[in-house]
A protein has these predicted regions:
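Positively charged n-region of N-terminal signal peptides that target proteins for export
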Residues: 1-4
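Catalytic Zn2+-binding segment of zinc metalloproteases
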Residues: 136-153
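Sequence context surrounding c-type heme c attachment/ligation sites in exported
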Residues: 109-122, 126, 147-150
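Bacterial N-terminal signal peptides
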Residues: 6-15
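Active-site alpha-helix of zinc metalloproteases
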Residues: 125-130, 139
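Boundary at the C-terminal end of the N-terminal hydrophobic targeting segment
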Residues: 17-21
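N-terminal membrane-targeting hydrophobic helices
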Residues: 23-34, 38-44
Length: 232
């Protein structure tokens, strides 16, 4: 994550004092303004299974599908995040600075996950079970990734804010914090959430497509060939 604005939005009181002494402003700030607080929540919203769309419809729903492949099943969701910022501010006219005790609340979630299995596959059949099992791997990747993002973001927040007030030129503290969140934290968290797509792509490997084409005594392959003929 880009470390922006730190030259202006100071994260340590040492900029205002000698190595081992607090200035009166530092003492007043640190003793009275309150604690810096960061809070993070992460949750998934569950999943559902949809068996109403054909493999051709699912293929159209998925971008960048190889021309010779059909999408037999599809797992869809959307990463969501929100960051709320509030702050207590204490000014010091003598120095022309202010100290800020931010409260940062981060919420991470996925939209309800929908697992699609092509309507050509009847529930209870071997082919349906194989396609569903493949999609459940995608579901697991999403559900396993969210706690990892939570852990990484929580550690980064703790390191950045360290339960210490921040210092800035008078009247600029909150605006600088908002800028840091918008240009630093939001892209950082978005990337962390988006890293799961590399895992999803690895699940849809050529080897996995080849395996699925051979399962259930060729039942899946016969459906694929039928749809290829219909497309031509």
């Amino acid at each position: 994550m880009k470390r922006l604005l730190l030259a202006v939005l100071l994260c340590c009181a040492g900029a205002f004092s000698a190595a081992n002494a607090r200035t009166p402003f530092q003492a007043r700030c640190e003793d009275s303004i309150g604690a810096t607080i960061t809070a993070l929540t992460a949750r998934d919203a569950g999943y559902s299974i949809n068996n109403t769309l054909s493999t051709m419809a699912l293929t159209r729903m998925k971008p960048q599908v190889h021309a010779n492949r059909f999408v037999l099943g599809l797992t869809r969701t959307e990463a969501r995040m929100s960051i709320k910022l509030s702050a207590q501010v204490l000014g010091d006219p003598a120095s022309g600075h202010e100290c800020i005790a931010p409260q940062v609340e981060v919420a991470l979630s996925y939209a309800p996950i929908v697992i699609y299995v092509g309507s050509q596959f009847e529930p209870g059949t071997c082919a349906y079970g194989e396609v569903l099992a493949h999609e459940m791997r995608h579901l697991k990747a999403y559900l396993d990734h969210l706690p990892k993002v939570e852990m990484a973001v929580r550690a980064a927040l703790k390191k950045r804010f360290a339960n210490q007030p921040l210092y800035a030129p008078a009247g600029q503290g909150k605006a600088l914090l908002e800028q840091e969140i918008n240009t630093g934290w939001m892209p950082y968290i978005k990337k962390q959430m988006g890293d799961v797509e590399r895992l999803q792509a690895a699940i849809d490997s050529p080897q996995e497509y080849a395996r699925l084409s051979k399962v259930c005594k060729g039942e899946v392959q016969s459906l694929i060939e039928s749809h290829k003929r219909n497309r031509e």
